[in-house]
Amino acid sequence: SFVTVMTASSALAQPSLTGMAYPYQNPNLSALTRAQDLLSRLTLEEKALLMLDESPAIPRLGIKKFFWWSEALHGAANMGNVTVFPEPIAMAASFNDALLYKVFSAASDEMRAQYHHRIRNGGEDEKFHSLSVWTPNVNIFRDPRWGRGQETYGEDPYLTAVMGTAVVRGLQGPEDSKYRKLWACAKHYAVHSGPEYTRHTANLNNVSPRDLWETYLPAFKTLVEEAKVREVMCAYQALDDEPCCGNSRLLQQILRDEWGFQYLVVSDCGAVSDIWQNHKTSSDAVHATAKAALAGTDVECGFNYTYKCIPEAVQRGLISEKEVDKHVLRLLEGRFDLGEMDDPAL
């Protein structure tokens, strides 16, 4: 009948909410509510796996594998047929933040389109094909011998903050939308401006308070407070004898307590391992895991993951499962905020 046909058509037009046994599966609930519900259903071992940048699937709960590491330095990186824009140092020379917003809004459109095309055709989330983007680089290009200077927006803290804000807003999309287009990341926090070859061992203990606050931190502060950047990446090196990814002054006192950052801290790749292997401020991987997590690092990017030791760190009393839960809640809320666990039609 006509009624039957119309009912069937309506069912096809709207994503079905049937089969949603748990609150975390309901897209009509807030990201935080869903994250809290899903967190309550995870084992400690599963929580530890979710804190890796290459998070495996958890089939029993319908959690897909997820990669936190994608790049969009000057357009979607490693994604095939996409638009490539000028390097950031060249775009900074335009002094045109409105244009930069358009550039990264276009880049985020392409990344979203590529992502959904992959998923709809039976693909999976992969490294460099995800919705978490480790851009922009808002380090200060102080020394022209630094080989990654072209990634930055130059030597001026104010210009870097203005351009970085445009990048974040272009990548993440409107704050009042149901989902973020992407999650952007302010990196590398903090005082990471070369040289590259000493980045895993350097201890920057000669940075004056004035230089720290007037040169190296303003762009990060602006991106957190004004652009609402969703991720901050802690750097490899140590600052004042504490590795940045285990530095509670940087990650807790300044970033969260003073600036009000509520979202995700990710490590640079291998930075948590550096805590015990290169900086030697921890005795072993388990101690380094606890140090980084207690300081505020939510997700570890690594190769031989130190955060796999989280269950042992809890068992040894170096960190509580309640503390682990704080990190996992943030990353789960992020995944719901991206719509990664929902029907793409939403």
Where are the predicted features?
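Glycoside hydrolase catalytic-domain context in secreted enzymes
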Residues: 9-346
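Bacterial N-terminal signal peptides
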Residues: 1-8
